Amino acid sequence: TQVHKNILFEFNTEVNNTNDRVADNYTQATSGQFHNLFVLDARATFSIKGFDLWVGKFLPPSDRSNLNGPYFLNVYNFPVVQAYPAIAAGRDHGAMVFKEYGGGKFKWSYGIFEGRTNASNADANPDENDNFLHAARFTYNFWTPEPGYYTTSSYYGAKDVLALAFAFQYEDDGAGTGTTAATQGDFTGWNIDFLMEKKISNGGVDNLEGAYYDYDTDDIPDTSLIQ
């Protein structure tokens, strides 16, 4: 909802189905659930001199697949190698700055978020000091710009796109299964993703998308992060 030319609010909810989603933290009270209804997004965006400040619960800077949301992926299944920390459905609580140039030719985002908690980790929370999760994403479009923070994996021939992006997340003591030196480590995750879509002469579209992911847990086992 646009309440002012420089202020926007977003509030979305989701309803649990009958599947067992405990592992995805949909049924935990700390995820904001009220009976079968939980808060999916709740954020305010303030536009200040060309910068957008986001505050609340939303998708942190991460890979294109996560920022696509459930309806703009090229395939039905979400990538199993995507293991960035999240409360539920890729979301986290925090604040972020977003900036784009040339209508989306180049854009970047950086934010600090709650990160690893008992709500996003079935084990004992390794980050007992409650350090921030730092998240950033940088995108360059070689062909037509892609405006806005959220992404899509196809424009269905509306424009030619060649986009390359780098995403990075880090949290002190954000990995592990406990709070001792033997069970606790820093979490570092990053990925490179690209999207190429080109209109062809017969009216069709060539589309190619890919990504590479890397995660480091300080050599501390943490199966809730590495899938």
Q: What residue spans do the PLM features occupy?
A:
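Outer membrane beta-barrel
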Residues: 1-118, 125-148, 152-157, 161-163, ...
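Detector for outer-membrane/organellar transmembrane beta-barrel domains
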Residues: 129-131, 140-227
